[in-house]
């Protein structure tokens, strides 16, 4: 455990941020799974939006976001 006051505060903030990031990533994965279970234009937009939000917040790399959206788009076209 940290001894310095600022380090203790940062550790607490890191825990909160980790929970927030995990929730955001989970929401993204849930949106993707919902689309894959039942491909539709509406679910594609929701999944694409979730991916973009995760990319903007730095949770996933921009290339991964692009790759994921391309794969979802290909499934929508089929």
Swiss-Prot record:
GO terms for MF: small ribosomal subunit rRNA binding; structural constituent of ribosome
Taxonomy, superkingdom: Bacteria
Pfam families: Ribosomal_S20p (PF01649)
Keywords, comma-separated and alphabetical: Ribonucleoprotein, Ribosomal protein, RNA-binding, rRNA-binding
A GO BP entry: translation
GO cellular component terms listed in the entry, alphabetical order: cytosol; small ribosomal subunit
Role according to the record: Binds directly to 16S ribosomal RNA.
Family as reported in the entry's similarity comment: Belongs to the bacterial ribosomal protein bS20 family.
Protein's name in the database: Small ribosomal subunit protein bS20
Source organism of this protein record: Streptococcus pneumoniae serotype 4 (strain ATCC BAA-334 / TIGR4)
Native organism taxonomy: Bacteria, Bacillati, Bacillota, Bacilli, Lactobacillales
